[in-house]
Amino acid sequence: MISRSLFARLLLAPLLAPPALGSEPGTMLAARVVEAAYVGTIAPLPPGAKRAEVWIPLPSTTPFQDIGDMKISTPFPATVEKDSAGNAVAHFTVEDATMLGGKEIEVRVTFRVRRAEVRAPLGRAAYGAPAPSKVPPDASPWLGENRMVPLTPRVRKQAAELAAGRRDAVEKAQAFYRYLVENGTYDKTTPGWGKGDSERFCDVKKGNCTDFHSAFMALARAEGIPVRFVIGFPINPESEGTVPGYHCWAEFWAEGAGWIPVDASDAAKSGDPEKRRYLFGNLDPDRVELSRGRDLTLSPKQKDGPLNFLIFPYVEVDGKAFSETKIRLEYKNA
């Protein structure tokens, strides 16, 4: 495997240039620093494959995580671009698939992350009186529909019923959160889970983190509240380990406070009332963000339609999506 780390670091500098940690509203308390490695494995390409393109999500610095010392290892030269939601993405091309000799492809992104706890100021005095008509330009893209998150008459009716009597974005979002936490079941056995299909979740009220937060997105957006989808990895409290799967959460926007996090699926899994209260407006530092957004257009643009969300390596073989990929996050406390 050929390391492209120096080339990638030079390209990453302008793409990952951060706002100051904690520059958005909210209070940072606990923090955690870990050395991490995102490992993506792509199964052997199908017989007869000629050309493949691969896109890899890269962690970015945000107001609540600092990313440093990033190194990208790929079997072919990679460039770093931004997708339609502003996520940093590494891209490389396999011009001749026979060069792989029927073997799998492994990509590895190592980095150091300082992740801070998020505590949003949920008091009314901090928020003022949010008004959907005053949504700032950078929040407006998060108001519309996604393919898996349509704003149907049913969801608009349900959102209006849940929001009745609520005075502002925070109270409405809290009503949606409580409804999902109290009525939803975290479940990865019922067919159709994991796609982030909000209509399915409304029908069965079961699913994983993607499904819970898609339902939250639909309800909040139906009431004119911007919501963005965030996906990454959970990090166990232990000092080191390997995480074989992703985790996601959401952030809604309220005037006077900015983006406020919610983790409805973790709350639904917990029977602890205090944890359920905490996960509306607060996040522990035991997670790493990889990307944001749904229906993503990558760079260079993929051929097989918008990408539902980005956490796995995205692969196109001769212009068609190839989904036989796996991920894991290896980490240890720094």
Question: Predicted segment positions?
Answer:
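N-terminal export leaders
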Residues: 2-11
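Acidic low-complexity segments
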Residues: 106-186, 192-203
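Hydrophobic h-region of N-terminal signal peptides that target proteins for export
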Residues: 12-21
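Low-complexity, Gly/Ser/Thr/Pro-rich intrinsically disordered linker/tail segments
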Residues: 283-334
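Hydrophobic/aromatic-rich core segments of domains that either
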Residues: 214-302
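Active-site nucleophilic cysteine motif
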Residues: 169-176, 205-220
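Intrinsically disordered, low-complexity N-terminal segments that are enriched in acidic
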Residues: 22-119
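Sec-exported extracytoplasmic/periplasmic mature domains
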Residues: 46-47, 59-63, 114, 160-167, ...
